[in-house]
């Protein structure tokens, strides 16, 4: 009797804490996203996370239609499940068409071999987007770079831009200083992007040299889906405009002690160069009337120092493996590809490398780290407007 009494008292003493734990249990939510990636003429990737492990999908319909299709990620006969981070690819869409989508998800409380226990089922609001138009004569997009984990700066730069006009945002590298903390892409720029535009319009991340650093850098591709092929480098087509994204790799030699023998960027850049040769030979690229390249580190060759305004800067840049290797590999290909303009970053200052016959056959605009770029490609050319964080226009020109 005495033992039973002690057990009862102990249970009663535990009840308040048990009830408190039950009362403070966090609800099942979509806690990041959704955000759009890899939008094309006929497909899109919808990304989001849930607060607990679950089984998720995307419902999609043409705007104005009641016919809803459910899309999930399936691999080797298994639907993706018991996870929190989701990237659901949707294909077979119509070009230049408005769609509406929402997230549906069920929490998974238990996942045993022969018994699955589901919990709460949730659904997001409906959000709208439009597939790209293969016949478009004009496209407008925004470029920002070197944000270095400063979400407030990211927000400020986006606020400078007419986001209602832009079809897409390109983040041109060093959006994070390194990737060393779980959830860092969200707090650095994805959450801000979702708030400003990314539920309805996509962004792509052109990696800088800083995103390759940190013990989590190899997981970055779980959050960023620039292309359906799963590469950071790729090409977007907006009707008559082609935009090539190149992945610069690190700025120093692969053998530099700071990398501890863990990087392989010389080979990676050479791989991209072979891919780029195929792109510029393709019918779709040759049909484009305007061609733009985006890469974080500006490719550099010695003869660029012949321009007086860059005579001091170029020799310094040539001491960095990233600049020199990109110049060696990429400029011979791009010089034959009728490129209109290249956008780069990295220098944290505003620099224009002008077109030089036989050296670099197009201007390279290096944006600083406190400005955003508005780019509008049309039959008039490639219009570029750079506005700094104070709202001052520092460059406005058509190429």
Which residue stretches match the model-derived regions?
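Acidic, histidine-bearing metal-coordination/catalytic regions of metal-dependent phosphoesterases
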Residues: 19-143, 163-164, 291, 378-399
């Amino acid at each position: 009797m005495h033992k039973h009494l002690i057990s009862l008292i102990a249970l009663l003493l535990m009840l308040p804490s048990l009830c408190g734990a039950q009362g403070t249990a966090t609800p099942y939510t979509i806690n990041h996203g959704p955000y759009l990636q890899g939008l094309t003429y006929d497909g899109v990737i919808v990304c989001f996370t849930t607060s607990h492990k679950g089984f998720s999908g995307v419902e999609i319909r043409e705007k104005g239609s009641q016919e809803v299709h459910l899309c999930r990620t399936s691999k080797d006969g298994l639907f993706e499940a018991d996870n929190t981070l989701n990237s659901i690819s949707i294909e077979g869409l119509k070009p230049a068409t408005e769609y509406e989508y929402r997230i549906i998800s069920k929490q998974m409380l238990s996942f045993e071999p022969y018994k699955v226990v589901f919990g709460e089922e949730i659904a997001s609001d409906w959000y709208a987007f439009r597939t790209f138009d293969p016949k478009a004569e004009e496209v407008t997009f925004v470029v920002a770079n070197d944000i270095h984990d400063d979400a407030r700066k990211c927000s400020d730069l986006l606020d400078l831009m007419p986001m209602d006009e832009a079809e897409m945002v390109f983040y041109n590298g060093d959006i994070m200083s390194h990737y060393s903390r779980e959830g860092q892409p969200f707090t650095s720029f994805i959450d801000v992007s979702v708030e400003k535009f990314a539920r309805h319009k996509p962004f792509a991340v052109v990696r800088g040299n800083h995103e390759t650093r940190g013990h989590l850098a190899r997981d970055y591709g779980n959050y960023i889906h620039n292309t359906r092929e799963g590469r950071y480098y790729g090409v977007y087509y907006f009707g008559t405009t082609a935009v090539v994204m190149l992945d610069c790799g690190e700025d120093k030699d692969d053998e530099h002690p700071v990398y501890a023998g863990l990087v392989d960027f010389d080979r990676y850049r050479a791989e991209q160069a072979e891919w780029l040769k195929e792109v510029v030979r393709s019918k779709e690229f040759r049909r484009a009337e305007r061609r733009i390249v985006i890469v974080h580190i500006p490719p550099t060759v010695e003869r660029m120092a012949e321009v007086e305004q860059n005579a001091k800067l170029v020799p310094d840049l040539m001491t960095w493996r990233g600049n020199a290797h990109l110049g060696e590999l990429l400029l011979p290909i791009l010089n034959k590809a009728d490129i209109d303009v290249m956008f780069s970053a990295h220098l944290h200052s505003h620099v224009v490398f002008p077109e030089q016959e036989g050296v670099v056959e197009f201007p390279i605009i290096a944006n600083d780290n406190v400005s955003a770029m508005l780019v509008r490609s049309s039959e008039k050319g490639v219009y570029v407007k750079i506005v700094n964080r104070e709202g001052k226009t520092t460059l406005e020109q058509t190429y």
